[in-house]
């Protein structure tokens, strides 16, 4: 299936998706408990295009499908210089701070938690990252995306 993003066509088949987090929300009602799920998904083509989305539904597969659809609406282009990023960058989103540093070739992706799938799906092969403050998956993913979007060649 193809979609239009700006002036370019996007082929969904060339994108990979990673489920970063699945959360369960409980609502207590007269008859017992009602469960709903939310899913945080990252999609990328390993060639500079990456996006994330949040989906909510009564069942996990439906939440993941909604999250993938949302991720394709929030695609960004990441500037990659060789196998790494062009310069150091630090960004804060709510209580989460993320620090991204370029690494020499052969270092690999040194990232933890929610940051690793983002940089891998963006196509960055060598990078050093540090997550500071809150490790809430949504906030860390959002901070990482904002930081990657601000990188200039």
UniProtKB/Swiss-Prot annotation:
<dbReference type="GO" id="GO:0003735">
    <property type="term" value="F:structural constituent of ribosome"/>
</dbReference>
<keyword id="KW-0687">Ribonucleoprotein</keyword>
<dbReference type="InterPro" id="IPR013810">
    <property type="entry name" value="Ribosomal_uS5_N"/>
</dbReference>
<dbReference type="InterPro" id="IPR000851">
    <property type="entry name" value="Ribosomal_uS5"/>
</dbReference>
<dbReference type="GO" id="GO:0015935">
    <property type="term" value="C:small ribosomal subunit"/>
</dbReference>
<dbReference type="Pfam" id="PF03719">
    <property type="entry name" value="Ribosomal_S5_C"/>
</dbReference>
<dbReference type="InterPro" id="IPR005712">
    <property type="entry name" value="Ribosomal_uS5_bac-type"/>
</dbReference>
<dbReference type="Pfam" id="PF00333">
    <property type="entry name" value="Ribosomal_S5"/>
</dbReference>
<keyword id="KW-0689">Ribosomal protein</keyword>
<keyword id="KW-0699">rRNA-binding</keyword>
<dbReference type="GO" id="GO:0019843">
    <property type="term" value="F:rRNA binding"/>
</dbReference>
<comment type="function">
    <text>With S4 and S12 plays an important role in translational accuracy.</text>
</comment>
<protein>
    <recommendedName>
        <fullName>Small ribosomal subunit protein uS5</fullName>
    </recommendedName>
</protein>
<comment type="similarity">
    <text>Belongs to the universal ribosomal protein uS5 family.</text>
</comment>
<dbReference type="GO" id="GO:0006412">
    <property type="term" value="P:translation"/>
</dbReference>
<dbReference type="InterPro" id="IPR014721">
    <property type="entry name" value="Ribsml_uS5_D2-typ_fold_subgr"/>
</dbReference>
<dbReference type="InterPro" id="IPR018192">
    <property type="entry name" value="Ribosomal_uS5_N_CS"/>
</dbReference>
<feature type="domain" description="S5 DRBM">
    <location>
        <begin position="15"/>
        <end position="78"/>
    </location>
</feature>
<dbReference type="InterPro" id="IPR005324">
    <property type="entry name" value="Ribosomal_uS5_C"/>
</dbReference>
<comment type="function">
    <text>Located at the back of the 30S subunit body where it stabilizes the conformation of the head with respect to the body.</text>
</comment>
<keyword id="KW-0694">RNA-binding</keyword>
<dbReference type="InterPro" id="IPR020568">
    <property type="entry name" value="Ribosomal_Su5_D2-typ_SF"/>
</dbReference>
<comment type="subunit">
    <text>Part of the 30S ribosomal subunit. Contacts proteins S4 and S8.</text>
</comment>
């Amino acid at each position: 299936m193809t979609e239009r993003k700006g002036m370019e066509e996007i082929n969904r088949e060339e994108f990979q998706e990673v489920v970063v987090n699945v959360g369960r929300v409980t609502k207590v009602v007269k008859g017992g408990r009602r469960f709903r799920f939310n899913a945080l998904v990252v999609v990328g083509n390993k060639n500079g295009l990456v996006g994330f989305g949040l989906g909510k539904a009564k069942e996990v597969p439906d939440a993941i499908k909604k999250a993938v659809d949302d991720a394709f609406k929030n695609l960004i282009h990441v500037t990659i210089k060789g196998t790494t990023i062009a310069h150091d960058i630090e960004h804060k989103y709510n209580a989460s701070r993320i620090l991204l540093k370029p690494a020499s070739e052969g270092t690999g992706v040194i990232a933890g938690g929610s940051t690793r799938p983002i940089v891998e799906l963006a196509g960055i092969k060598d990078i050093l990252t540090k997550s500071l403050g809150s490790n809430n998956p949504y906030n860390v993913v959002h901070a990482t995306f904002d930081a990657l979007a601000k990188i200039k060649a």
